[in-house]
Amino acid sequence: MADSSAPGRPLRSVCVYCGSSNTTKPEYLDLATRFGQALAARKLRMVYGGGAVGLMGRCAKAAHAAGGDVLGIMPRFLERREITYQDVPHRMVETMHERKHMMFEESDAFVVLPGGIGTLEEAVETLSWRRLDLHAKPVVFLSEDDFWAPFFALMQHTVEANLTPANFNDAVAYTRSIEACFAALEGVSAPM
């Protein structure tokens, strides 16, 4: 597993983990749209799961419509369920493991928008790889409400139980605005 996060390397590509449900809160769909636009405005390539539905579809479509570079990575068995977004380049893979590995390899950083169990699985694996020193890429959770608060409370519980190192928070940021998210990606302190 290559790590493209050498100190001083410019941020060029952001992997976005997020939900594929169209029936979630409109606020989450709106956040995904605005985040995609923000990626394009900053000339950052979006790498994501390749779907045209839910937050992932909204984010990719917004980035693409704003002139951004988008790369989707889709396992063949999910083509019908997540409906591959055909307007952007995409790579087809056979397994979820290949998808996650390729998303990792193609990205300089990770942003986690609201999502379900698949989003959590991707985010936790990325954090686990970071904990194992397999990479030093930024991992930033973003929600404008307290969507991720229960996750971070659980992580703090594991720290207090001596199951997760106390420096866990050094490997991840929890932001509540797009501006704070990009500041965290760039290693700059901004209001959360």
Question: What annotation goes with each model-predicted range?
Answer:
Residues 98-133, 140, 189-192:
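Active-site/ligand-binding-proximal alpha/beta "capping" segment
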Residues 2-106, 144-192:
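A cross-family phosphate/adenosyl-ligand binding-site feature
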Residues 64, 130-137, 163-164:
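Arginine/glycine-rich "motif VI" loop of SF2 helicases in the C-terminal RecA-like domain
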